């Protein structure tokens, strides 16, 4: 049986959401000389890259470092969290990016890892917030908040430079 698939955000919609999120980050961090943008692998990292590019364009005097955080999304406690490149977090401000916030388990585990690195401040970004929390975490900046049933699935597809969000 074929899955029903509804387009929630097309590429143009996603680009507008990313631009708005980048603008909100710029408003918050325009005075800072350095900012770490950490994307949760794989889609969160690709979104973080797009956000970092826009932030760097509008804050040319700031150093924007893009990092990829790898975590087992199905079972975050099963494997160690890794980060690349392995830059110092010490007393720095961090933006943590993921594609979808559902139960909060992955974002919570990633945030816990980053907080353990003696950072100065952290904000969280997600493209889609489903509002099905099992853990006490929130996204500071959200592209789209969507109420879904537990049985429905949000799929963020990134093909080359084209990003779309589907409800399945």
Describe the role of every protein-language-model region.
Residues 1-168:
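PRPP-associated nucleotide enzymes
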């Amino acid at each position: 049986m074929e899955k029903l698939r509804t387009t929630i955000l097309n590429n143009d919609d996603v680009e507008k959401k990313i631009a708005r999120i980048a603008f909100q980050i710029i408003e918050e961090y325009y005075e800072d000389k350095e900012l770490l943008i950490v994307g949760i692998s794989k889609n969160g990292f690709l979104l973080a890259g797009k956000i970092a590019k826009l932030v760097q364009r509008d804050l040319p005097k700031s150093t924007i470092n893009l990092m990829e955080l790898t975590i087992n999304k199905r079972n975050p406690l099963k494997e160690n969290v890794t980060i690349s490149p392995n830059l110092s977090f010490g007393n720095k401000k961090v933006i943590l990016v993921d594609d979808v916030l559902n139960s909060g388990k992955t974002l919570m585990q990633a945030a816990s890892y980053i907080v353990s690195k003696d950072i100065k401040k952290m904000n969280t970004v997600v493209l889609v917030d489903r509002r099905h929390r099992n853990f006490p975490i929130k996204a500071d900046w959200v592209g789209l908040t969507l109420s879904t049933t537990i049985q429905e699935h949000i799929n963020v597809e990134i093909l080359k430079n084209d990003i779309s969000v589907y409800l399945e």
